[in-house]
């Protein structure tokens, strides 16, 4: 979450003025469309809820209040997605995930040969396909997205009292799903934002490289993730 924040901030700081303004304009268009589409009682020009002192270290110079609000909304969304994107991992991480995929593939192979499936095989197949959208999604990512929706719909909903805060919550939930699913909305490709968390050099890898080395007993100099995140640039 912290590294994703720095990568997002520095990517915009290092971008040329035209690229940054065009990028934020595209993001503002997305927010305005969602507000209108879902009839949310919030305004992009007056979002005091996101004027959070805890986020000052991640602020960037902007030309308007609306542009600052746009940046902060997406910063918060990216932080939530980064925090929760791996929450769907099963015990022993990818190993169990690969094993379950092999079980599913064997059941599908058996089904294609028109062989009868036992009750357990049929139940496993149906559950797996329901969670992974007919095996189109990676298991831990699909589980994570479902958990994110539950978090927004139940846990966070109960923590907020003011009605306008709940409206913001609906907005961030929608943006989070757009990022996780790498959807294209209002002409903007959300894969661009997902790349901060899931790409060749991303916040996730920078984080777990240091943690895995420490956990495995390999004591050496950690990678300089601050220097690396400072090199991020939006093009």
Task: Describe the residue ranges of each PLM region.
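Sequence-structural signature of the catalytic-core scaffold of metal-dependent phosphohydrolases
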Residues: 2-80, 88-235
């Amino acid at each position: 979450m912290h590294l994703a924040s720095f990568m997002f901030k520095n990517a915009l700081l290092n971008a040329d003025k035209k690229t940054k303004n065009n990028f934020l304009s595209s993001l503002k268009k997305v927010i305005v469309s969602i507000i209108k589409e879902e009839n949310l009682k919030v305004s992009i020009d007056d979002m005091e809820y996101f004027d959070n002192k805890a986020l000052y270290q991640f602020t960037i110079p902007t030309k308007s209040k609306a542009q600052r609000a746009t940046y902060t909304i997406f910063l918060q969304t990216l932080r939530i997605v980064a925090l929760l994107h791996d929450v769907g991992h099963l015990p022993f991480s990818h190993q169990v995930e690969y094993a379950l995929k092999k079980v599913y593939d064997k059941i599908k192979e058996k089904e294609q040969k028109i062989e009868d499936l036992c009750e357990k095989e049929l139940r496993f197949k149906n559950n797996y396909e329901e969670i992974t959208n007919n095996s189109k999604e990676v298991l831990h990512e699909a589980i994570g997205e479902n958990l994110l929706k539950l978090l927004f719909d139940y846990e966070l909903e109960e923590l907020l009292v003011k009605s306008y805060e709940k409206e913001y919550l609906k907005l961030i939930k929608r943006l989070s799903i757009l990022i996780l699913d790498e959807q294209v909305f209002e002409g903007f490709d959300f894969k661009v934002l997902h790349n901060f968390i899931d790409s060749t050099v991303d916040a996730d890898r920078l984080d777990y490289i240091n943690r895995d080395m420490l956990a495995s007993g390999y004591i050496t100099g950690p990678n300089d993730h601050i220097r690396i995140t400072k090199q991020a640039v939006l093009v």
